[in-house]
Structure formats: C-alpha cells, structure tokens
Amino acid sequence: MSHVQPVRVGRIEIRTICEGWAALALADEAPGQTVDWDGERERRPWAFVGTDRWRWHVHAFVVRLPSGMTILVDTGVGDFPPYAPWEESVEDPWQEVETADVRHVMVTHLHADHAGGTVIGGAPAFPNATVHVHEADWSAFAGSTDADDYVARHAMSSLLELGMLSITDTDREPVPGVHLRHTPGHTPGHRSVIVTDGDEAVLLTGDLLHLPTQAAHPGWWSSHDEDPQLGAASRRLVLWRAAQDGWRIAVPHFARPFGSVGSKGWLE
C-alpha cells in the first residue's frame, strides 16, 4: 500500500510499499555544509515539515519484470525491534503483495529501514526468495548488535542457515536485466540496483541519495554516511550515468520517490 502511483519504465512496473514517515531535523542532516534550506523549501515544499525538519519516508519497491517475475528492492523496517520512528505509519503496508510470489530481494544495505523487513517473527518474510547482500556489509556488521547499531545483520542469519541468502562481493546480474552495482560510502557494502528493459532503465538508489539537494550537489553528504567522501564519489559516478542515459530514478526516503536527474538536480 502506498500514496504513490506505480510507474512504468518500458515493460517494467514499479510500485512502492510505504511504511510511514517521520520528521527529521535538518540540523542533523548536512553537517559542516552550507545549504540554502529556504530555497530548497520553495522548490520542493513536499520534502519538508515546517522550517527545520524534512519529511523522511520509508519506501520499499516491488518490481515486476517483463518476464513476469516479481522482485523487491529493500524491505523496509518490518517488525525490527525496537525501532518505531513514525510520525504516521501505515497499518499492514504489504497487504496487497503476494509475498510467496517474490523470487528475489535486493537489499541495498543492512540498515534496519532497508533490511529489517526480510524477517518477520524470526521467519522469512518472503519464503520463496533469494535475498542478496554485499559481502562488505555482511562482514562490516558481523560484530554489531542489531537493535543498538540499527542493522538487521543478526536477524538475517536465519536466512543464511536456510540457504536463502546470497552474499557476494562483485557487481552482478542475478536476474536478466537486474544489475547490482556496488556504491559504497553510506555503508561499506552499499549497493544500488539498475533494472533495464532494452534501452530504458530505472535506478533504485538505496541511500546513495538521502536528500533531494544531493542530486544537484552530489559532493554533499548525509550525516548517516559512514564514509562521506567515498559516498560522494559513488554518487557522482552513478548520477552522471543516470543523467547521460536518461534513467528514471527511485529513492526510498523521498516523499515523492520517482524522478530523474538533470543539470539542475532533481526533476519530478
């Protein structure tokens, strides 16, 4: 369930699952950087709450491929304990998704708002799916405590025991037309996903983009990035390619998650 209408890119259909939203303080988002927040609010009022907070949404993406296969990019928070950040939440956001029909889950990174929903009540949320994770994230968070460190690493260990987890360290195409691209910086093993149909493509960024301002200023970072400089390098490269080739873009934390990028930044 979502407030966002599905989009089509070629024969690819993309729907969002919106779990809810929270209002986060702008002062915490861009440390050490000078941002014209008043100008940003004028350009994109939908992205802000009042004068000092932005509207942080959590979207997962349901992608139906031309072959008819259903895949997911990220899974949202799910019932990850004890995280409940919502200003407003959606009751049973997955009610319109046949979870047994999902064949692959592309986890962009192991933060709980992206991977927490892979496991529900200790059991696989998507029982017939292979769940894809980059090895660098799996290793980096091996010593974490899930709730304290806000990652779903240990919760997902049950998927490994069941043989449902694919942990790899290369860019790859696990399904025809679905490309996993290593875009480190936010986390060591952060991935973005590019889904193609002929000459058309959609880039599902993960947290490569966290704020709309970063589309025009890819060198700006979020306070949530573990390696800000590496994240900026990943962002510059991928957004340059997206602009050159006219890719559609889907961003999980934007209130309006679908758009594209041009010379002036984020385009709806």
Where are these regions (language model features)?
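Residue-level marker for buried hydrophobic side chains located in beta-strands
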Residues: 71-73, 106, 131, 202-204, ...
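Conserved beta-strand hairpin/beta-sheet module of binuclear metal-dependent hydrolase folds
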Residues: 3-95, 192-211
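Metal-dependent catalytic neighborhoods of phosphoester/phosphodiester hydrolases
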Residues: 83-85, 116-125, 261-262
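Metallo-beta-lactamase
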Residues: 88-113, 125-182, 230-246
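Cap/insert and terminal regions of metallo-dependent hydrolase folds
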Residues: 200-268
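Active-site metal-binding loops of divalent metal-dependent hydrolases
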Residues: 19-20, 75-78, 110, 136-137, ...
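Active-site glycine- and acidic-residue-rich loops that bind
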Residues: 111-114, 179-191
